Amino acid sequence: MQRQAHTRKPKIPDAHGQVASLTQVVEFQQDKEQRQSMPAKFRAWFNIKLFRFKNFAVCALLMILVGGILNATTVLQPQFSQELLHYTATLAGEALTAGGVALLLIMPLAGIATGRFAARNILAIGFTLFAAAFYYTSTHLNLGISFGFSSWLRVVQVAPIPLCFIAITNAAYFGLPKEASNQVAGIINFVRNVGGSIFISLTGAIVTDRTLFHEARLSENMQLSNPAYVNQLTALTNAYSGVAGGPGAVASARGMIYRQLNQQAAGQAYEDIYRVLAWLAVGMVACAFLLSKKKPGEGAPEAAAG
């Protein structure tokens, strides 16, 4: 039996991979040297001792909530548009565009306000606007809204975000030494992402649960003893009789009513979740007053870590 000789091609080193690996080594070494130059208590990757400073701990909590609300609403509205308004993914994303433009316009104003007023006051205003925005959304959200009104709802929802984000980020550094700046920035960004993950999961679960709840309640009216249901069933049966006569028309009519029931139940579930977010924002107003009364430039409200 004749064996075929196989020639092995020499492996050519991946230049891009080597450069990337070398870059990671250099960055790790630089980070290690920077961490070693810090005081011992600030060398940990995440220094949880920073949470003993009340101002920082409150800011971390508020950032979890704000980041969670931002990410949850960014998922909820396109999800509502695609499932119930039958938007394409592209069209649902375009409905969020106006909110991004609003953020660009409001961000400089929020920065000016943060430099003049205490962070707790700005946050209280921001969370009050959040509560009003979500309540407004819950009372105006329906299955017949237009693309323009859907974009307007997004503008209303994101308008308070710059006030809250900038104020929390600035207030988180009050009372902390400069050596902890990197730690503060890292933890604040980390808890924001954690809050986003938690809220996306929770709001999705609540929407599903409330949809089932409303389906059960609405289905109680789908009885032959209900004149409204009988009239609707008769009208749809007559409409479908030309397409599917006899039992087929009745089945098609009941299917149409059931689809409408599912849509109404899902719409009410989205209204419920926005009401939940509104009440959460009301509670965040109270949390804002746990922060220091100091304005920017008035000095640290607490003693530096020693």
For every predicted segment, state its role.
Residues 21, 39-213:
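12-transmembrane solute porter fold
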Residues 1-31:
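N-terminal low-complexity segments that are often proline-rich with Ser/Thr-Pro
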Residues 3, 31, 39-44, 290-299:
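Helix-loop junctions on the cytosolic side of multi-pass membrane transporters
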Residues 22, 193-287, 292-293, 299-306:
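Hydrophobic transmembrane architecture of multi-pass small-molecule transporters
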Residues 32-36, 109, 136-140, 207, ...:
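Residue-level signal for alpha-helical transmembrane segments in multi-pass membrane proteins
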Residues 3, 27, 32-40, 206-211:
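Structural signal for alpha-helical transmembrane segments and their membrane-water exit/capping regions
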